[in-house]
Amino acid sequence: HAFEPTYLPKDLSLEEVAKRNLLNVKAAVLSYGGHDFYKFAIQNAETYKNIFWWLALAKPRGVLGKKFNPIDYPDIYKAISPIYNIPDSSERKLPPQLLTAATRDRITPVRMIKQYGVALKEKNQEFEFWEHLNRNHAYLDSGRTLIAGNDFIRDGIPALKVMMNFFDKHL
């Protein structure tokens, strides 16, 4: 498969866009970061012990389908887990990343997001960390969320302002 952008600036060809490195990611915001699918799967995320299957009224299934599981295929799970694939900055510098977390998030808790930050720091990669104080998981969901008790206007908009400031600084 070849990359075919759905948008190109009027004055530039695809070749010119590529030559100017305009397709490169310049900065990234990671929200509700799933950085370690291997560890998550080992901790029963793909079983009924994960409350999300109950809430979704769905049958548990593996992230990678029926054939693969984290016990028999740890390398595959680690291959899709960013925390195991961070290059040293001397080999390849990643774009700056904003890692976001919420104080009361029990699904992607602050400590989990900070673990990814530690891994980035060990590889000398640039990142910033921001914690949305006294907020639950899913603070960016639109409208109001009954289970988390979030309201997008109260909880999401302040988070988006932090994210936009990050992009303004790096783009």
Stretches with model-predicted labels:
Residues 33, 101-104:
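Cell-envelope and extracellular/periplasmic
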Residues 96-100, 107, 111-171:
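C-terminal catalytic histidine-bearing segment of alpha/beta-hydrolase fold enzymes
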